[in-house]
UniProtKB/Swiss-Prot annotation:
Compartments where located: Cytoplasm
Main location: cytoplasm
Pfam family, one: GidB
Catalytic class of the enzyme: transferase
Name this protein carries in UniProt: Ribosomal RNA small subunit methyltransferase G
Any one Gene Ontology molecular-function term assigned to this protein's record: rRNA (guanine-N7-)-methyltransferase activity
GO cellular component terms listed in the entry, alphabetical order: cytosol
Binding site for S-adenosyl-L-methionine: 79, 84, 130-131, 149
Keywords assigned by UniProt, alphabetized: Cytoplasm, Methyltransferase, rRNA processing, S-adenosyl-L-methionine, Transferase
Function: Specifically methylates the N7 position of a guanine in 16S rRNA.
Family: Belongs to the methyltransferase superfamily. RNA methyltransferase RsmG family.
Superkingdom of origin organism: Bacteria
Gene name linked to the record: rsmG
InterPro entries linked: rRNA_ssu_MeTfrase_G, SAM-dependent_MTases_sf
Length: 239
């Protein structure tokens, strides 16, 4: 996917980028590739692949959750890594307020460099594990949206994310081909953590790769014991 393809595909989906935003994506790509030479950020480094599989893919969630485009919503991105999906969303929709969480200091330093270089505001970067931060009153049940892009199966992701979502907010699940079965397997965990599946969307990227976006509504407060201590959700998922 070239720059032009990226701009055109987004335009077809109702997302129009300004010249400044196009430049910000270009600079983001340059920083990603340069830093990736000494910090493990991504296995995807070809420009056309980064634009498709990181930038475009990150923005697909706003095609199905329209409020991300136009409101000053708050979004927390768990295990953000190199900033996906939250930084592409922030670049495309500047009013969105984002919080990025990652456990690796080197990645946090990279994210700060991107935020500073692109002169982004309304961004907080938190170094730590979701299980610890999810028990912090500053962050707990304080966000309109939480997302995590393919960092674990849905039953585990739910424990990482739903404690951050306020009642009436949403957990946005972004997944590849195994998503539907994961959602079925994760129903008990979602319910126990206060979530309820609202909708599931299946679509393909411009290259034909299948993707799922699942929208989980936060209906009730998450019990205080969740998230459990660091490492437990992945070792002993709620089932």
């Amino acid at each position: 996917m070239t720059n032009e393809d990226f701009i055109e595909a987004l335009s077809s989906a109702g997302i129009t980028l300004t010249t400044q935003q196009v430049r910000q994506f270009e600079r983001y790509y340059e920083l990603l590739v340069a830093t990736n030479e000494h910090v493990n950020l991504t296995a995807i480094t070809e420009k056309k692949d980064v634009y498709l599989k990181h930038f475009y893919d990150s923005l697909t969630v706003a095609m199905y959750e329209q409020k991300l485009k136009s409101s000053e919503s708050t979004l927390i991105d768990i295990g953000t890594g190199a900033g996906f999906p939250s930084l592409p969303l922030k670049i495309a929709f500047p009013d969105l307020k984002i919080t990025m969480v990652d456990a690796l200091k080197k990645r946090v330093n990279f994210l700060q460099e991107v935020v500073d270089t692109l002169d982004l505001t309304g961004v907080e970067i938190v170094h730590g594990r979701a299980e610890d931060i999810g028990q912090n009153p500053k962050y707990r049940e304080n966000f309109d949206y939480a997302t995590a892009r393919a960092v674990a199966r849905t039953s585990v992701l739910a424990e990482y994310t739903l404690p951050f979502v306020k009642i009436g907010g949403r957990f946005l699940v972004m997944k590849g081909s195994a998503a539907h079965q994961e959602l079925l397997d994760g129903q008990k965990a979602l319910a126990m953590l206060g979530g309820q599946v609202n909708e599931e969307f299946v679509f393909t990227l411009p290259n034909g790769d299948q993707r799922y976006i699942q929208i989980v509504d936060k209906k009730t407060k998450t019990p205080k014991k969740y998230p459990r201590q660091a490492g437990t959700p992945s070792k002993k998922p709620i089932s």
